[in-house]
Amino acid sequence: MRIGHGFDVHAFGGEGPIIIGGVRIPYEKGLLAHSDGDVALHALTDALLGAAALGDIGKLFPDTDPAFKGADSRELLREAWRRIQAKGYILGNVDVTIIAQAPKMLPHIPQMRVFIAEDLGCHMDDVNVKATTTEKLGFTGRGEGITCEAVALLMKAAK
């Protein structure tokens, strides 16, 4: 078994909506990013790549490459997952923690889980997404942006 950890953060800027976990969430502010700014899928992609020792999302999809300007993070996740499967790994489970003072994530979590399960070709039981705040402390608590952490467990497929 192999475990990977991912982290991502984006500052608020511009106009909403925002995209988190593949879900378009109405909000007055947007997130500043080269791609669509989906902190949940970026952290998850990093966790998966880390578990497979394939580097990170910035190595695979550099923000210096104009091809990834405004990229759909679901497509990036699916491409990373294809590469991980090509190395002979299968998914154990993933766990994603979104850290944001606002907007509220709870109403959107079921759809996030559906999208992640679809993108990874796994059961919903293998995908957990949760959200919390920092009780108004720090960068996220002041409403300056959104942070996300994720862990992923991979196993070698039976031959």
Swiss-Prot record:
- State any single GO MF term: metal ion binding
**What is the enzyme's class at the highest EC level?**
lyase
- State how the cofactor is bound: Binds 1 divalent metal cation per subunit.
Report the catalytic activity. 4-CDP-2-C-methyl-D-erythritol 2-phosphate = 2-C-methyl-D-erythritol 2,4-cyclic diphosphate + CMP
Per its UniProt record, the required cofactor names are: a divalent metal cation
PROSITE patterns, A to Z: ISPF
* One GO process term, biological-process aspect: terpenoid biosynthetic process
- Where a divalent metal cation binds, per the record, is at D8, H10, H42
Q: What EC number(s) are associated with this protein in UniProt?
A: 4.6.1.12
Site note Transition state stabilizer applies to H34, T133
Residues annotated to bind 4-CDP-2-C-methyl-D-erythritol 2-phosphate: 8-10, 34-35, 56-58, 61-65, 100-106, 132-135, 139, 142
Q: Which Gene3D superfamilies match?
A: 2-C-methyl-D-erythritol 2,4-cyclodiphosphate synthase (3.30.1330.50)
Q: Which Pfam families match?
A: YgbB (PF02542)
Q: Which UniProt keywords apply?
A: Isoprene biosynthesis, Lyase, Metal-binding
Q: In which pathway does it act?
A: Isoprenoid biosynthesis; isopentenyl diphosphate biosynthesis via DXP pathway; isopentenyl diphosphate from 1-deoxy-D-xylulose 5-phosphate: step 4/6
**NCBIfam families given for it?**
ispF
Which family does the similarity line name? Belongs to the IspF family.
User: What does the record give as the function of this protein?
Assistant: Involved in the biosynthesis of isopentenyl diphosphate (IPP) and dimethylallyl diphosphate (DMAPP), two major building blocks of isoprenoid compounds. Catalyzes the conversion of 4-diphosphocytidyl-2-C-methyl-D-erythritol 2-phosphate (CDP-ME2P) to 2-C-methyl-D-erythritol 2,4-cyclodiphosphate (ME-CPP) with a corresponding release of cytidine 5-monophosphate (CMP).
Self-association and partners? Homotrimer.
The protein here is known as 2-C-methyl-D-erythritol 2,4-cyclodiphosphate synthase
Species of origin reads Salmonella arizonae (strain ATCC BAA-731 / CDC346-86 / RSK2980)
